[in-house]
């Protein structure tokens, strides 16, 4: 099993991470509660809805959003057809996030963002495609890579949870900067995504 091989690699390559893995225990299914693997648009909608929120708040907001559309992710056409203020109030979204959802829908409908191509692209190319959409920054693109496309070797150096978990696990004097994080994570390659899941889990704060 791919995860077993990844865990074995992480355990053997980093004694600090090995101890953390032992402490955290088995991980759950990263796809639980998420849009289907073939629903790229739904996954991006979920990512936007959860930006800059706690894990619990993100799940609540996304649940309210899908409840407005028969408990499923909305289509691009449905987002654009909905009245923005009504959507904002019903789901508890900020006005900025409503504008981001509309921008995403417009990019998909116009063909500027070809979701069906993303699986064929490398990680950096996927990021470049996504950050061209208003409201989708590097962090959002990396979450999409990790949790939807299930790319195995992603390290989101801007994620506060990962920084806090590294600071605690490695007994750092302060939150690590990107260079420090890259250096710590080098031995984890090509399983940095899996390592990050353990780091999040150590804080009980895996994005959901």
Question: Where are the regions a protein language model picked out?
Answer:
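A general alpha-helix detector
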Residues: 43-48, 64, 83-86, 125-129, ...
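C-terminal accessory module of base-excision DNA glycosylases/AP lyases that mediates lesion recognition
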Residues: 1-32, 98-99, 112, 119, ...
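Residues at secondary-structure transition points
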Residues: 36-40, 56, 74, 95, ...
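Alpha-helical scaffold segments that form or flank carboxylate-/histidine-based iron centers
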Residues: 36-52
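Alpha-helical ds-nucleic-acid-binding substructure associated with the helix-hairpin-helix region
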Residues: 53-134
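Short amphipathic alpha-helical segments
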Residues: 18, 42, 46, 58-62
């Amino acid at each position: 099993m791919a995860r077993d091989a990844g865990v074995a690699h992480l355990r053997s390559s980093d004694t600090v991470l090995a101890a953390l893995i032992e402490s955290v225990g088995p991980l759950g299914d990263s796809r639980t509660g998420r849009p289907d693997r073939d629903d790229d648009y739904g996954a991006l909608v979920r990512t936007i809805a959860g930006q800059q929120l706690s894990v619990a708040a993100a799940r609540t907001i996304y649940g309210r959003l899908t409840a407005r559309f028969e408990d499923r992710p909305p289509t691009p056409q449905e987002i654009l057809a909905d009245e923005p203020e009504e959507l904002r109030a019903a789901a508890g979204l900020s006005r900025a996030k409503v504008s981001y959802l509309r921008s995403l829908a417009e990019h998909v409908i116009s063909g500027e963002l070809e979701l069906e191509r993303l699986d064929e692209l490398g990680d950096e190319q996927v990021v470049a495609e996504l950050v061209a959409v208003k409201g989708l920054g590097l962090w959002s693109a990396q979450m999409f890579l990790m949790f939807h496309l299930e790319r195995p070797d992603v390290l989101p150096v801007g994620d506060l949870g990962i920084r806090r978990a590294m600071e605690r696990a490695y007994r750092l004097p302060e939150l690590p900067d990107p260079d420090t994080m890259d250096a710590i994570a080098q031995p984890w390659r090509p399983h940095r995504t899996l390592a990050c899941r353990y780091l999040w889990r150590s804080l009980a704060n895996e994005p959901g």
